[in-house]
């Protein structure tokens, strides 16, 4: 058991080092997925021997260990293959190669620089969904890895795979799920694509899909941007209608289709800061922000730091905090709020301190990775 604990500690040290390094080198991300694979192999072996804990770590069930190890192996192999191509010279962040990004449409492809578009079903703005058009899609074809741009038409969002259009979002299928009339409108920036049956004139673009996508990203100013994708022969502009002024944000984070009335899917990438009260904001190490609020003096309270981020990162970080036990009173397990979307980066841990001095000393000494965010506060004292 002692040997397994030591190996697990070494793996988790490597994982946390990868988070803190925030590397843009693909070889570092290969090392990360190797460490994740090894971590889950250790968990699997421990569970096979009926061990439910390794040190202070709870051992997941066999099915969870196996599933996570398989994902790590799949991504490790894909990255090792991609590393042998000319694309290994590009910048790759950990969020570009994370599990959620890998399984976001188009699945089992690497993707970069997503642009949001809106689709209104049944012509109603209140029944709209959001989708992502990727500037770059990296897929493994018959001749190895290829880099292409995705584009949008009235039918859906697609990219060219081995000379053929591959739709990863089909608006007709989406309209069946979310609409009643089987019609929809596509809105991207100041341009719109409407149902061809609803107008008498037809607009055709002579610009190829790839050219249009690249042109869009080379003009990011809202007033001069060109639409992502191309208007196909079946798409039309409504005569006498001014372009919509909806301007979606450009982001690298990955989101799947959402509607106003439905929960949105989680983004793979975590933001480094929380939006807190700007009137009492401080800047902390790692780009985090904090918010001090007035506490009713009638209650006995303790200063705390809430740390938000991806669950596995927080677990590793909590483990590393044990080296600084003298700098805090206690630390919670990983948790999340139940009334919000349980996204990848919506997990929390809370660190409790005996006084403000101890908390400040903790923040000065303990290295906090930029991939998580901090919020300072106070909590009513509990048994500790």
UniProtKB/Swiss-Prot annotation:
Listed A to Z, the keywords are:
Activator, DNA replication, DNA-binding, Early protein, Host nucleus, Isopeptide bond, Phosphoprotein, Repressor, Transcription, Transcription regulation, Ubl conjugation
Question: Where does the source fall among the domains of life?
Answer: Viruses
Query: Which SUPFAM superfamilies does the record match to this protein?
Result: E2 regulatory, transactivation domain, Viral DNA-binding domain
Major site of localization recorded for this protein: host cell
Q: Where is this cross-link: Glycyl lysine isopeptide (Lys-Gly) (interchain with G-Cter in SUMO)?
A: 308
The record's section on InterPro entries has: E2/EBNA1_C_sf, Nucleotide-bd_a/b_plait_sf, Papillomavirus_E2_C, PPV_E2_N, Reg_prot_E2, Regulatory_protein_E2_N, Regulatory_protein_E2_N_1, Regulatory_protein_E2_N_2
Instruction: Cite the record's Low complexity compositional bias ranges.
Output: 251-263
Post-translational modification, as annotated: Phosphorylated.
Q: List localization entries.
A: Host nucleus
Give the start-end ranges of region Transactivation domain.
1-200
Q: Where do Polar residues bias regions lie?
A: 220-237
Q: What's the short name of a Pfam family annotated to this entry?
A: PPV_E2_C
Annotated spans, DNA-binding domain: 301-384
Q: Which GO terms describe its molecular function?
A: DNA binding; DNA-binding transcription factor activity; nucleotide binding
Q: Which GO cellular component terms, listed alphabetically, does the Swiss-Prot or TrEMBL entry include?
A: host cell nucleus
Report the record's Gene Ontology biological process terms. Answer: DNA replication; DNA-templated transcription; regulation of DNA replication; viral DNA genome replication
Region named Disordered = 218-292
- Keyword rRNA-binding part of the UniProt annotation: no
Q: What does this protein do?
A: Plays a role in the initiation of viral DNA replication. A dimer of E2 interacts with a dimer of E1 in order to improve specificity of E1 DNA binding activity. Once the complex recognizes and binds DNA at specific sites, the E2 dimer is removed from DNA. E2 also regulates viral transcription through binding to the E2RE response element (5'-ACCNNNNNNGGT-3') present in multiple copies in the regulatory regions of the viral genome. Activates or represses transcription depending on E2RE's position with regards to proximal promoter elements including the TATA-box.
Protein family (similarity comment):
Belongs to the papillomaviridae E2 protein family.
Q: How does it assemble?
A: Binds DNA as homodimer. Interacts with protein E1; this interaction greatly increases E1 DNA-binding activity. Interacts with protein L1; this interaction enhances E2-dependent replication and transcription activation. Interacts with protein L2; this interaction inhibits E2 transcriptional activity but not DNA replication function E2. Interacts with protein E7; this interaction inhibits E7 oncogenic activity. Interacts with host TAF1; this interaction modulates E2-dependent transcriptional regulation. Interacts with host BRD4; this interaction mediates E2 transcriptional activation function.
Protein known as: Regulatory protein E2
């Amino acid at each position: 058991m002692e040997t397994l604990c030591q190996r697990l500690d070494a793996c988790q040290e490597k994982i946390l080092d990868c988070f803190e390094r925030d590397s843009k080198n693909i070889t570092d991300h290969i090392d990360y997925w190797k460490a994740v694979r090894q971590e889950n192999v250790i968990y699997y072996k421990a569970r096979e021997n009926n061990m439910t804990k390794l040190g202070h770590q709870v051992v997941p069930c066999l099915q969870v260990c196996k599933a996570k190890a398989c994902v790590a192996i799949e991504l490790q192999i894909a990255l090792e293959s991609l590393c042998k191509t000319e694309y290994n010279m590009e910048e790759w962040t950990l969020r570009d190669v994370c599990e959620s990004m890998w399984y976001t449409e188009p699945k089992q492809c690497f993707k970069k620089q997503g642009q949001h578009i809106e689709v209104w079903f049944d012509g109603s703005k209140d029944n709209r969904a959001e989708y992502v058009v990727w500037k770059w899609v990296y897929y493994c074809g018959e001749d190895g890895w290829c880099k292409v741009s995705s584009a949008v038409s009235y039918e859906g969002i697609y990219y060219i795979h081995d000379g053929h259009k591959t739709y990863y979002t089909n608006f007709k299928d989406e309209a069946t799920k979310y609409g009643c009339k089987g019609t929809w409108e596509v809105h991207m920036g100041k341009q719109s694509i409407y149902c061809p049956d609803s107008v008498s004139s037809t607009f055709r673009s002579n610009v190829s899909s790839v050219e249009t996508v690249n042109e869009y990203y080379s003009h990011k100013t809202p007033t001069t941007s060109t639409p992502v994708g191309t208007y196909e022969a079946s798409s039309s502009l409504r005569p006498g209608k001014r372009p919509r002024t909806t301007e979606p944000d450009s982001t690298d984070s990955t989101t799947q289709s959402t509607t106003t009335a439905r929960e949105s899917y989680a983004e793979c990438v975590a933001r480094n800061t929380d939006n807190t009260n700007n009137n009492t904001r401080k800047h902390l190490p790692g780009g985090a922000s904090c918010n001090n609020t007035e506490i009713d003096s009638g209650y006995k309270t303790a200063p705390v730091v809430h740390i938000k981020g991806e669950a596995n990162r927080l677990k590793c970080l909590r483990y590393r905090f044990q080296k600084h036990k003298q700098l805090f009173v206690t630390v919670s397990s990983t948790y999340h709020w139940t009334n919000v979307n349980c996204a990848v980066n919506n997990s929390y841990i809370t660190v409790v301190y005996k006084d403000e001095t101890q908390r400040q000393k903790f923040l000065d000494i303990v290295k906090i990775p930029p991939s998580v965010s901090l919020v300072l506060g106070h909590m009513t004292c509990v048994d500790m």
